[in-house]
Design a protein with these regions (language model features):
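Intrinsic low-complexity/IDR segments
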Residues: 2-8, 14-294
C-alpha cells in the first residue's frame, strides 16, 4: 500500500511538472519572440495553443487589417502539437490580424493534431514543413513565401486551402499525400513547382493557377477529379505516368513543352479550348476518354 501511494504521488508530481514545463515553454517562447531571439524546439509535445498574433503588438496596415512582425527565426523539429497552431486571428469587430515572419518558418517531422492556420502570412525566409502530418484542416490561403518552400512528404488528413497564395521561389510537394480536398485556386508560382509522386484522394483544385517556372506532376495519382482549367503554364509541364480519374485542362495556355506520356485515365482527360505554343503532345489514351476542341 505504501509503495502504491508513493507511486501515485510521483505520478501527480510528474503531471504537474509536465504542465508547468509546457506553460513555461510557451512563456519563454513569447519572451524570445519579443526580444527577436531565434526559437528552436525539438522532440517536444506541446499542449498549448500556439498563436503568433498574440506574442507581439499588432500595427494597422490597411483598413480592418493588422499585422504582427516576427523577427525571430522559428524552428520546430519532431514536435507534437496537441492544440491549434495559428498565425491568423479574426477579431470580434471583423478585423483580422496577420503575421509577417522575417526569418525562416520551419516545422520538420512534426504532427499537428488540431487546425493549422497561416492565412495571409508573409514568410521572408525559408518555409519548411517537410515530412509533417496535418491531422485536421490546414489553411495557407493568401500565403506569401519569398524564399523556397518545402511541403514534401507531408500528409494532409483534413481539407487543405492554398487559394490565392504567392510563391516567389521553388515549391516542393513531392511525395505529399492529400486525403481531403486540396485547393490551390488562383495561386501564383514564380519558379519551379514540384508535385511528383503525390497522391490526391479527393478533389484537387488547381484552377486559375499561374505557373512561371517548370511544373512537375510526374507519377502523381488523382483518385478523384483534378481541375487545372483556365491556368497558365509559362514553361515546361511534366505530367508523365500520372494516374487520373477525371482531369480537366480546359482553356489553359501551355507556353512550354508538355509531356503527357503513359497516362492512365479512368473517366476523362479534357483539353477543350486550350492553347499550345508548341506541338500538341501525343496522348495515348482511348479516344472516347480524350476531350479536345472540335
Amino acid at each position: 500500500m505504501k509503495h502504491f501511494i508513493l507511486a501515485m504521488v510521483a505520478l501527480v508530481q510528474l503531471s504537474c511538472a509536465t504542465q508547468n514545463s509546457s506553460t513555461n515553454e510557451d512563456n519563454s517562447m513569447k519572451k524570445l519572440i519579443k526580444t527577436d531571439q531565434p526559437i528552436y524546439i525539438e522532440n517536444k509535445t506541446i499542449d498549448e495553443v500556439i498563436d503568433f498574433t498574440s506574442y507581439l503588438d499588432a500595427h494597422l496596415i490597411s483598413e480592418g487589417v493588422y499585422q504582427v512582425n516576427v523577427k525571430s527565426g522559428i524552428t520546430f523539429k519532431k514536435c507534437v502539437f496537441k492544440k491549434p497552431v495559428s498565425a491568423f486571428r479574426k477579431m470580434e469587430d471583423g478585423s483580422v490580424v496577420l503575421t509577417s515572419f522575417q526569418g525562416n518558418v520551419t516545422f520538420i517531422d512534426c504532427f499537428f493534431e488540431e487546425d493549422v492556420n497561416f492565412r495571409g502570412s508573409s514568410i521572408y525566409g525559408r518555409t519548411d514543413f517537410t515530412n509533417s502530418t496535418f491531422d485536421k484542416s490546414a489553411n495557407f490561403e493568401e500565403l506569401h513565401c519569398h524564399e523556397n518552400a518545402f511541403f514534401n512528404k507531408c500528409i494532409f488528413e483534413g481539407a487543405l486551402r492554398f487559394q490565392n497564395a504567392f510563391f516567389n521561389q521553388r515549391v516542393n510537394f513531392m511525395n505529399a499525400e492529400f486525403y481531403d480536398t486540396a485547393s490551390f485556386q488562383n495561386s501564383l508560382f514564380n519558379s519551379e513547382l514540384q508535385f511528383s509522386a503525390g497522391k490526391f484522394f479527393k478533389y484537387a483544385d488547381f484552377t486559375l493557377i499561374d505557373c512561371r517556372g517548370r511544373v512537375l506532376f510526374n507519377y502523381t495519382e488523382f483518385r478523384d477529379k483534378a481541375d487545372f482549367s483556365h491556368s497558365i503554364f509559362a514553361q515546361d509541364l511534366g505530367f508523365i505516368n500520372t494516374k487520373n480519374h477525371t482531369t480537366n485542362f480546359d482553356s489553359c495556355r501551355f507556353l512550354g513543352k508538355v509531356r503527357f506520356n503513359n497516362l492512365e485515365v479512368v473517366s476523362a482527360l479534357s483539353l477543350t479550348d486550350s492553347y499550345f505554343m508548341f506541338d500538341i503532345p501525343e496522348i495515348n489514351i482511348p479516344s472516347e476518354k480524350l476531350m479536345n476542341s472540335k
